[in-house]
Amino acid sequence: MRTRKAKDRSRLIQAAMGQIPCDLTIGNVQFFNVITGEIYPASVDILDGFVVLVREEGQEAVLPSKSYYDGQGRYLIPGYIDTHMHIESTMMIPENLARAILPWGTTTICTDPHEIGNVMGLDGVRFMLENAKKSKLRQYVLAPSCVPSLPGMENAGAEFLAREVGELLDMDDVIGIAEIMDYVGVIHDSERMHTIIDEGLRRGMFLQGHAPYCFGRELAAYRIGGPVSDHESVNADEVRAKLRAGMHINLRASSLIDNLSFLVDGCKDQPWRDFVSVCTDDVHAKDLLTVGHINNVVRKAVASGLDGREVVKMATFNAAREYGFDDLGAIAPGYIADIQLVDALDGSRPKAVFTEGVLVAEDGKYLGGDCKTADYDLPNTVNMPQIAGPESFVLRVPEGYTGDTIRVNVMVSEDGNRILRHVEPVELPVRDGAVDISGDPTLVFVCCANRYGRGGKTIAVYRDFGHHFARQPQLHRQLPRSEGRLPRRRDPARVRRRCLRDRRRAGDAHRPAGCRPHEPEALRRGRRRDRGRAVRARCHQRRTAHPAGDRHHGAAGAAERGHYGYGPRQRRQPDVRTRVCGCGSINQPETEKG
């Protein structure tokens, strides 16, 4: 599938032959050819947003281009492609999402708007499509297949059946059916899923999968049912099984689930990995600003043992082949000029990013204009009268129950990564007619509530979900810090001491001119210990020399203080003046004698 048609193909042919000048040449680069795996010096000529020629070293241009960008010896690679993403998780509109991820090298995303579809139906999906057209980020949409996600188990703001999915598939920039989460319905050939999948198959469109813990006969039935990819593998064995079954695997690193290292273990021992690409799924705005987007997946995959060149290929060429994009994912004649310049093939932030041959980001800054507020005409859909305060999240026992404990089905995560593994019955105490989990810091309450004003909510108990969140302040004291289940309380004094320790270890590297060198901590403690001994010795001498007349050290002073002399309960503190140097560290205190 060609994602963009050239306005005038004849012009591209003429530019390739050197008969007309190109718009842009990116030169002085180390060209990474994701098709062959080679790296060699080259220059790339671009016209009308397409690559027309890759000139190897020694091949001169016939006509100079209108503009030239010096790559300064950096690697030239294609723009990253995210094979599966929910824009709603970023809390941004598509137009503003481009500002956040283009500087990180992502130039194409394939999105599933089922979250806004669950709330606003077709109107919500249309809004995402129209707003995406205003950005310089290439955004393709897949029609949500499971709205609601679990029919009969939840209430949604809309319902997508075959008719609604077919209507979406006929829209521009809709390229397939999004994650088919009802894999049970697929393998049992339910009428609802069968008719929805048929809408995509009749049009020859991409069918995206979503089938965690799927093996053997069930996996075979799911693959035959239509889906060709999966991003929900939870361990290495599942990755191997799905690759062997002919499914595309999307290595995922999201803000919610981070099990990428386990997934890499399942594919790095395979000799061929052409069916492996990458995705982010759900990523929060904070992570986009701090660690990036697809480049963060690349970084983690490299850290897990994969070769940087192969991971870049997964994030570009493999991703494009998965969707059948014939003009994306590589830098070659006839391909769209979505390009980035990077210092290394390790997921680092790009120096420059181009979409269709236009510079859109440089040095981590978006060059496409100011952030905009969407023309939002969708109604407010959040109406939750059943959530009125803390009492709304109390799990009550059945009326008339008089026992001290009650058996509760507790949901349990796998390895603390928030993937629901199983449910286990647990005896929990009852207090004031409600389940009490205060004695177990690994338990939290979770609540699922209807947000459409229809009332109703469900409260359950979850174990090991709190690895990533602090529930109550007192739990920091109850839970041993060595277990690492909850973050430590941030003590300003502790933070300052650690900063001073780090600066001392760094030596003179962070010390401004004129600042005295930091004393070793052992010497500093020794000086304080010697000072205390000297003060106690002087006190003893004064008590001996003035047993009755010294107000501060004699009997009168002792009577006034309620005990004799300066013992362990009360020590005279010298007047200390602390000097702080320009680097923020504390130099040796100076003592004024009284």
Q: Which sequence ranges carry the predicted segments?
A:
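Divalent-metal coordination cores built from histidine and acidic residues
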Residues: 2-16, 20, 98-206, 511
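Residue-level marker for buried hydrophobic side chains located in beta-strands
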Residues: 25, 67, 79-81, 278, ...
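Active-site beta-loop-alpha junctions enriched in small/polar residues
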Residues: 86-88, 114-116, 144-149, 180-183, ...
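Histidine/acidic residue-rich metal-binding segments in metalloenzymes
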Residues: 124, 159-179, 185-251, 257-278, ...
